[in-house]
Amino acid sequence: MRSERLRWLVAAEGPFASVYFDDSHDTLDAVERREATWRDVRKHLESRDAKQELIDSLEEAVRDSRPAVGQRGRALIATGEQVLVNEHLIGPPPATVIRLSDYPYVVPLIDLEMRRPTYVFAAVDHTGADVKLYQGATISSTKIDGVGYPVHKPVTAGWNGYGDFQHTTEEAIRMNCRAVADHLTRLVDAADPEVVFVSGEVRSRTDLLSTLPQRVAVRVSQLHAGPRKSALDEEEIWDLTSAEFTRRRYAEITNVAQQFEAEIGRGSGLAAQGLAEVCAALRDGDVDTLIVGELGEATVVTGKARTTVARDADMLSELGEPVDRVARADEALPFAAIAVGAALVRDDNRIAPLDGVGALLRYAATNRLGSHRS
């Protein structure tokens, strides 16, 4: 998960309430179940002496949120000042999670976030395209109607002008493909989408792909979704594109796992594992990707700054800082990673780093732990 969108959490002052719950809307009693869930959440927060304004802001977010479609979860992160995260999850969490802490708890977001990178969906035919740009919660739509005409070849074989008509048709198709290709190229250059989905009949997709410049064509994922005029709704577009995003997510985790194992194996200094090494790398701003495994109830200590994390008090004292707080590792380490702009990846049991946490590093530091002691 890219952490840029969560960067503003670092500037917020706690305590934070982090709540993840089943927000599915697939039964007749969905509204009643949501109300019951919220009552349980409220009771738990009250038992932890959460401030009333924090509870009120969460309650308002729950009651005013748009209902989910089908089986979904919901993530809420709030302080007494504002709701910082309020979004659906791709599925319900295994159980309701409620945290009240100096840190926001973001680990379930890594697993279940619905938010996608910027992408484009284009439904094309030989007359033009319907193009949508997705950036976070914003959707920008453009209809491209090419000026080339006609785009259908005659079926009458004996017509004297068939050759000229065929040439005119092919030229019209090329003009319209060029208009769509030019628009997609401008979108890619301006918005930098991670993927450009192209749907439509095979010939329309093939002709467009051959017209696109290479820097755009490499981002294209073709979808077999029928003709442009089928006019897919947002839920259908979501379902059609989900497989590609799932594939990319799996490929990302696979790549991280392979790179981590390779760097650990060769002792390059470009990977770290275990609480001591990862905390040191986070303090140095050296973490490119944080790998979060099963941290359980593990804790770390921090100095005055919430991002000054160490495995224990002795390591912190070597930095000349007293212990200001003891924090859960699964809260403090992702928070520190967000602060340095690192990506967050969940270990799916393929990596199993020491102490349940690992990292890919931006640069190799010789004897990092020893240098902090000297």
Curated annotation (Swiss-Prot):
Keyword Transcription appears in the UniProt entry: no
Pfam family for this entry, one: baeRF_family2
Single GO biological process annotation from the record: response to hypoxia
Induction section of the entry: Induced by anaerobisis (at protein level). A member of the dormancy regulon. Induced in response to reduced oxygen tension (hypoxia), low levels of nitric oxide (NO) and carbon monoxide (CO). It is hoped that this regulon will give insight into the latent, or dormant phase of infection.
Record keywords: Coiled coil
Lineage top rank: taxon: Bacteria
Cellular component aspect of the GO annotation: cytosol; peptidoglycan-based cell wall; plasma membrane
Keyword Oxidoreductase belongs to the record: no
Sections of the chain in a coiled coil: 39-66
Effect annotated for changing residue 64 to A: Common variant in the Beijing-W clade/SCG-2 phylogenetic group
UniProt-recorded name of the protein: Uncharacterized protein Rv2629
